[in-house]
Amino acid sequence: MVMRTRPLAAMAVRSCFSALTGTVYLLLVLCEVSWAQIFSFPFQRPETCDLNQYFDISALSCAPCGANQRRDALGTSCICLPGYHMISNNGGPSIICKKCPENMKGVTKDGWDCISCPNGLTAEGKCHCPSGHILVERNVSGSLLSQATCELCDGNENSFTKPNALGTRCVRCEPTFVNTSRSCSCSEPHISTGGLCFSNTGNFPQRLISTERYGELGMSSNSEWFTKYLQATAAACWTHSNLTSCQALGNMCVMNMNSYDSTTFDACRLFHYVFEGAAGLTGVHSVPFWRQNLPWLFYGDQPGLASQVLSTTPLPTNFSFKGQNQLKFVAASYDIRGNFIRWQTVKGGVLQLCPDTERRLDAAYSFGTTYQQNCEISLSKLLADFPSPVFYDIYLEYTDEVQHHYLWAIPVLNLNLQHNKLFVNQDSSSSKWLLTRRIFLVDAVSGRENDLGNQPRVIRVATQISLSIRLVPNTKNGNIYTPLLTIAYSDIDIKNAYSQSVKISFSVKYEMNQGDAFVQTDIALGVLGGLAVLSSLLKTAGWKRRIGSPMIDLQTVMKFLLYYAGDLANVFFIITVGTGLYWLIFFKAQKSVSVLLPMPVQEERFVTYVGCAFAMKALQFLHKLISQITIDIFFIDWERPKGKVLKAVEGEGGVRSATVPVSIWRTYFVANEWNEIQTVRKINPLFQVLTTLFFLEVVGFKNLALMDPSSSLSRSLSDYAAPYSRILRYAVATTIWLVIGIVQVVFFAAFYERFIEDKIRQFVDLCSMSNVSVFLLSHRCFGYYIHGRSVHGHADTNMEDMNMNLRREAENLCSQRGLVPNTDGQTFQIAVSSQMRQHYDRIHETLTRRNGPARLLSSSGSTLEQSIKAYHAMNKFLGSFIDHVHKEMDYFIKDKLLLEKILGMEFMEPLEKSIFYNDESHSFSSVLYYGNEATLLIFDLLFFCVVDLACQNFVLASFLTYLQQEIFRFIRNTVGQKNLATKTLVDERFLI
């Protein structure tokens, strides 16, 4: 019985445990669901709450007010209903209200007590008093009266009081009321405006324009600010010389874009009216445009005055890149009512609407740093940050030799200014400009209509601010003229401030007179261009001699233009590289500033020169490429049959003696080697591109192209990055590219070719070992000859004989390889006679009559036989020509004169005999990539720079440069291979 009970008990325990586990798991799941739900709640705003609800700033939702309560004006707490007073107030909504008794229905202004009101109640349940009276609820000691009283303020002489704005006490009337009407009222015939009282007996204009003009939008707005305060401000400034009123009047003129129209009495016309009326007063700080008690708004409207202000007097201080390199701009700031706020430095983004770190914002005032800042800001942010405009008078602070501090006024060029309805400041001639002084950034007040508490209909924003600093010509100490602040405003018609935005830009640019630099560049271009013409004429004359044509025809003119394009490309390249290095070295290395970088507009001529250099170099490159893939070439096989063999004759059933055929494989082998060296270069193109990119992007040489004085290769991410100068980018890129290219060429010539591999000389050796010579004509009567005739008589031999022949050569047991006995000269430049060329062409016509050798196997037997006969005929003719067999087409060998080598032309004309010029420099490489490395290197460099100047991206430029290198290499290989197969009868299928 006991044994049976224990299992049942155990089963019961397990069942209970399982149920408990399931319950706990379910609770956890429900808790997780509950926790997930509390992360989301309804979105409510204070204005969506009901009248009997307030907005709980903790729960961010609407909550009900207590009994006899309603929400306050802000909507974040509760107040008692009219007729109820507070008996408890713990702040916010925690109040308790109690109804006032019937005999005391009024509530005191503080809301804590009930009081009897003899003159009735207001809508809020407070006591009401007639006009000119103040409400008295307590006696002098502060005790509450049983009944409120209304006391009349004494407006008579000796008192001149009236209720204050709250109606709680009597205050003295505004002085203009007392002075004008000897009372606190301003009745006819006096004029009351803007809370002031003026007499109408003066000569102040009555017809005022309170309309704000928005030229960009083509509309006008009836500004409530101007309606309320323009006349009063102008009158107070005119009649009383009130300082703040005069400042406020000046602010209104600035808000109206400093525009002047002689036919309307707007803010600026009123300011000029007051300004002219103060002509008898002394000028402030000896400035004729700054009258006493008035702000300095204008420089005057005399023609040419702007040019004098900006270009006549240098600042009495100097700047450098190493010491005093900060522009200390300060601003006198005023509020819209004309009150002086404070002196403040413009650092920290005072004039910059775009947000950024203080370090980057302040970089705008580092001397020599070209600054550019752009952003897009929502109108809602501008309205929130600038509810009222702040006005600035900008000055440059400097110290003299004895460390006394002075201010230099900064003129403003307002592009929105209209003078008699003309935008004079948008004219290209500075003689027509009208300079001003005061600026603001955002005006959200003048665009308010009917009520100053309304959202403005139009907002005016300074969307473009540019500070121009010009260097004094020929200065050595960093002297500058007066900086110019150019500002342009945009008028935005507000539809939805949260969805609308405006683009803002702030820039600081430096300029100097580039006339001398342009003149020097033009002189260099003229001199070098003249030398290029002379060089092209010599090349054309040499070409005419090499083609054996004395006539000047259209082909000659075209050839001259092609040569001139190549030489002129070199001229432009030299000038642009020299110009770029000049700016890079002199700008970055100077301490006392004497030069400043050209501005982007001034760089256009330089960019044009680079474009011309690239276009002409591309034309030269294509000219050379086409010349290389159309050369005439033939491989002369000197191998002779070694004997005769018996050969079966088809169709005759017998045998006969036949010459042992010479193997064609040696010719195929030489042809393949020639095909391989067609695009061999003295540099590695991929290494060139990658190394250049490494130094520019990784090492940081591209930072030298920034338009700032720093020469550091590394920049912190927290630092401001100035825009790039296209001239400096070009200078840095060309310098690095040329240095890497020259280092590669020197390494290739001094080390690689000496100790590892020299493909050009190896090819000449291969020709000798293969018993094959190369006859090459790059022009009709000019070309190259590689003498490959074996000194051993035969090259088609076994390994043992080949090694023995090499040993005999090494031990000088045989004759030398040269064409002339007992010499080593194997390479020659050849100038062939016209007779020899004609004979060559007759044989060559038979050789190339078919459409290339690629279809040898599919050709008919007769055609193949004719081609083979033509090949043997050409081989026999050229071999006999080299062996002086044809006396009528003989040749002689000589050395070229030094002047001939320098000019690249031949003075002697091969009339009767051809001329072989000894050529130890292997100049036959000029028909290969190898001999045109300078052209290829400069072409690749110019391609790289043109792409970078277009897109400002070294990575993209590197990729596209390598891509074009590979494309042209493929074209050169493919077409050159087809030409080789066509001219030599080597089947293209054997060129691997």
From Swiss-Prot:
Residues 546-555, 629-667, 769-923, 983-992 are cytoplasmic. The keyword Membrane applies. Residues 668-676, 677-685, 686-698, 729-754, 755-759, 760-768, 924-926, 927-933, 934-949 dip into the membrane without crossing it. Residues 36-516, 588-600, 699-728, 950-954 are extracellular. InterPro entries: Growth_fac_rcpt_cys_sf (IPR009030), Meckelin (IPR019170). Disulfide bonds join 49-62, 65-78, 80-97, 100-114, 117-127, 129-150, 153-170, 173-184, 186-197, 237-246, 253-268, 354-375. The keyword Endoplasmic reticulum applies. GO terms for cellular component: axoneme; centrosome; ciliary membrane; ciliary transition zone; cytoplasmic vesicle membrane; endoplasmic reticulum membrane; MKS complex. One of its GO terms (molecular function) is filamin binding. It is a multi-pass membrane protein. GO terms for biological process: branching morphogenesis of an epithelial tube; cilium assembly; determination of left/right symmetry; epithelial tube branching involved in lung morphogenesis; ERAD pathway; head development; heart development; kidney development. Residues 1-35 form the signal peptide. Glycans are attached at residue 242. The chain crosses the membrane at residues 517-545, 556-587, 601-628, 668-698, 729-768, 924-949, 955-982. Part of the tectonic-like complex which is required for tissue-specific ciliogenesis and may regulate ciliary membrane composition. Involved in centrosome migration to the apical cell surface during early ciliogenesis. Required for ciliary structure and function, including a role in regulating length and appropriate number through modulating centrosome duplication. Is a key regulator of stereociliary bundle orientation. Required for epithelial cell branching morphology. Essential for endoplasmic reticulum-associated degradation (ERAD) of surfactant protein C (sftpc). Homodimer. Part of the tectonic-like complex (also named B9 complex). Interacts with DNAJB9, DNAJC10 and mutated SFTPC. Interacts with SYNE2 during the early establishment of cell polarity. Interacts (via C-terminus) with FLNA. Interacts with TMEM218. Interacts with WNT5A. Interacts with ROR2. It is linked to Defects in Tmem67 are the cause of Wistar polycystic kidney (wpk). Homozygous wkp rats develop nephromegaly, hypertension, proteinuria, impaired urine-concentrating capacity, and uremia, resulting in death at 4 week of age. Early cysts are present in the nephrogenic zone at embryonic day 19. This is Meckelin.
